[in-house]
């Protein structure tokens, strides 16, 4: 065994306590995690209060999907804070940090698999879209997150990290297509186009920030440190999750009549029944 591989093995066998120590000694990284835990806690309480009078099934479904966003988030950040979903990865030859053990908060990519479908479910219900379109957006989104996780975790080949990044981007394009082309027309027909338009722009602009950060951060070309990258994601999360969800819930609570269908009209091709 060479000296380099011995060091690598040592770090790769780091215990959860070692990882925790490393997180806690990195102020930027640690604060980016704890600020989000605190915010998610406040947001959960706020959303419970905001949704307490919502009665119609479709509006309720939007509310539950929206509530799940900070609920998944607080669990995700608690996983990162404890070191459970953070590990050391030895970057492959060709990577800017080749041979070094880089702290990877991979749990983020894993938990996006659960939070981002909730954002899309809420948006799809708001637009009163059809089930095929909703299924497409959610499955493409899950594909994006899982292949993004693969891109972050691959240590055998630099090229394959970027191949998976490319696959993830292709899934992302499908999500963007649904959001930008299909759902605006559904929202127009459902009478929710104003709020949908605002949330669509917020979502598309902020979501584009994630692959850019990935590419610039330590997973990609390593122009940004682990702490700065983590604050980047945390900042995007605050806007793409809490601000997004707040705007959506505030609108739903004030305009329940506009989303008062059964919540099961999904599959009807977006057309609401006449007596809806
Ligand atoms: C990755 C890297 C690979 C390429 C692409 C990505 C996109 C990620 C996105 C994440 C959105 C996350 C949100 C989380 C809220 O809980 C995986 C970074 C395209 C769009 C909104």
UniProtKB/Swiss-Prot annotation:
It comes from Halobacterium halobium (strain port). The chain crosses the membrane at residues 26-51, 58-81, 106-127, 131-154, 158-180, 193-216, 226-254. GO terms for cellular component: plasma membrane. CDD domains: 7tm_Halorhodopsin. Residues 52-57, 128-130, 181-192, 255-276 are cytoplasmic. Residues 22-25, 82-105, 155-157, 217-225 are extracellular. The modification N6-(retinylidene)lysine is found at residue 241. GO terms for biological process: phototransduction. Light-driven chloride pump. Its main location: membrane. It holds the Pfam family Bac_rhodopsin. Belongs to the archaeal/bacterial/fungal opsin family. It is found in: Cell membrane. Residues 1-21 form a propeptide. It is a multi-pass membrane protein. One of its GO terms (molecular function) is monoatomic ion channel activity. It comes from the Archaea. The keyword Calcium does not apply. This is Halorhodopsin. Keywords: Cell membrane, Chromophore, Ion transport, Membrane, Photoreceptor protein, Receptor, Retinal protein, Sensory transduction, Transmembrane, Transmembrane helix, Transport.
